[in-house]
Regions:
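Feature captures hydrophobic
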Residues: 1-122
Length: 122
C-alpha cells in the first residue's frame, strides 16, 4: 500500500499545499518491510522498498503489519485511526529527528492515512 503513496498524494493539491515546506526522507516500517518515503515540497517523489543496509532518514514510524492493516481500514476503530494513539499503546514507535515530523504533523498523518482510500476500492 505504501508504494502507492506517490499517486495517492500527488493527486491531492490540498495535501501537497499543506506539506509544501517538507523536504525530507522518512522511514515507514510495516512489519519486516522497510520503506523510504522521499518528499519534496509536499510531493511524494518516490517510495523505496527495503531491506536497506544503512538507510538515511530523518524520522521513522514503525509498526507491525497487523497494526498498519488496522490503521489503513477505510473506517478504523477508535484508537486504530491515529499514530499517537498507536504509539501510546506501544503498537507503533516514532523515532529520529521529530522536529520536522511535528512541524508537519497533520501532513504526515494524512499522507500515511492515504492508503485508506485503497481499502474502499477493494
Amino acid at each position: 500500500m505504501i508504494e502507492k503513496l506517490p499517486e495517492l498524494v500527488n493527486n491531492n493539491e490540498a495535501l501537497i499545499r499543506r506539506g509544501r515546506w517538507l523536504n525530507d526522507v522518512f522511514l515507514v516500517e510495516v512489519g519486516e518491510i522497510q520503506y523510504l518515503v522521499h518528499v519534496a515540497a509536499g510531493r511524494v517523489e518516490c517510495v523505496e522498498i527495503g531491506p536497506f543496509v544503512m538507510p538515511s532518514w530523518t524520522f521513522a514510524i514503525r509498526g507491525s503489519e497487523a497494526t498498519w492493516r488496522r490503521f489503513w481500514q477505510s473506517l478504523p476503530a477508535p484508537g486504530d485511526n491515529d499514530l499517537f494513539a498507536l504509539r501510546k499503546t506501544g503498537e507503533m514507535t516514532i523515532e529520529g529527528n521529530l522536529k520536522p515530523f511535528m512541524a508537519n504533523l497533520i501532513y504526515v498523518k494524512e499522507v500515511l492515512a492515504m492508503p485508506r482510500l485503497l481499502d474502499d476500492k477493494t
